[in-house]
Amino acid sequence: MSENAGTPKKQGRNNGAVVMMCLSFVFGMGAMSYAAVPLYRIFCQVTGYNGTTQRVDQVSSVVLDRTMRVTFDANVAPGLQWDFKPVEREVNPKIGETIQVNFTAENRSNETQRGQAVFNVTPGEAGVYFNKVQCFCFTETDLKPGEKLDMPVVFYIDPEIVKAVESKNIHTVTLSYTFYPKEGPKPVASNEGGAEKIEKKL
């Protein structure tokens, strides 16, 4: 009798352990999925994988007697009514030379909009050698209705690009940007209205 009575309790404990293991697995997979995007972004920034350019604080001390053709591409994702384009479609700096180019963005909507630029370089092998000293893509951009903004990019091509087997024969690279909408802070009036509603409810 005692052995039979103890069996359901043991099975219950086993079932509980299985449930806990399943829940832990589900939560663990969810956490990994949430962290995958920022971790992948960090990996690309460090390695230059997938055409991600490098961010640096200093310029190159070496300038080669060889030029690199750099073309520019500008795009705007749905949700932003912006006119976004490069001032120059291409430049031909010397490899290692620090150069500034400019883009312009104009808000065509009747409301303030916030955007964040995402960038990459093609061919992807050149990404690790494309170094940005200054870029509007490092921060979010707010544009009021009808506002037009000049946005500089300061960069250079690392001279090491001519030494690597996978990149030494590259003569043209394309720097591409896409602006995506970002949610801005709520207006103060909206917050105050919410506070009044809470006070009345209390």
UniProtKB/Swiss-Prot annotation:
Q: What are its GO biological-process terms?
A: respiratory chain complex IV assembly
> Per the record's keyword annotation, is Membrane included, yes or no?
yes
Q: Name one Pfam family in it.
A: CtaG_Cox11
Instruction: Return the InterPro entries for the record.
Output: CtaG/Cox11_dom_sf (IPR023471), Cyt_c_oxidase_assmbl_CtaG (IPR007533)
Gene3D superfamilies found in the cross-reference section: Ctag/Cox11
Q: Which residues form a coiled coil?
A: none
Compartment annotation? Cell inner membrane
Q: Which GO terms describe its cellular component?
A: plasma membrane
Question: Which residue stretches are annotated as topological domain Periplasmic?
Answer: 38-202
Q: Which UniProt keywords apply?
A: Cell inner membrane, Cell membrane, Copper, Membrane, Signal-anchor, Transmembrane, Transmembrane helix
Q: Keyword Cell membrane on this protein?
A: yes
Q: What does this protein do?
A: Exerts its effect at some terminal stage of cytochrome c oxidase synthesis, probably by being involved in the insertion of the copper B into subunit I.
Name of the molecule in the record? Cytochrome c oxidase assembly protein CtaG
